[in-house]
């Protein structure tokens, strides 16, 4: 896993004990390397609200389909990470930090952090704006 300053990946991503999370299209064995905290539930198949979702996408089309689906499942304080291939990875993609951010902002979320998810994937973290969290809670 890529890292900086020795910070564990799970801490960089903000996954905490008791979280209900989704890892969407994650690379094989990705979850095994996260060293998840206790009581974290990886949840893809049910419709339970998510504290954390990480979408691995290679195309703008994938992102425009997946972003609203997982935004709708977030808790008011939840976070949605979008991960796309780094330019240096050699993976073919039409995504960049700019268009990932544009799609997220258009969906009503705000980006608050960027990091290397691993040697291939970059990640951008989105959350609901503070003033929107009460509205999300009531939906």
Where are these regions (language model features)?
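Class I S-adenosyl-L-methionine
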Residues: 108-139
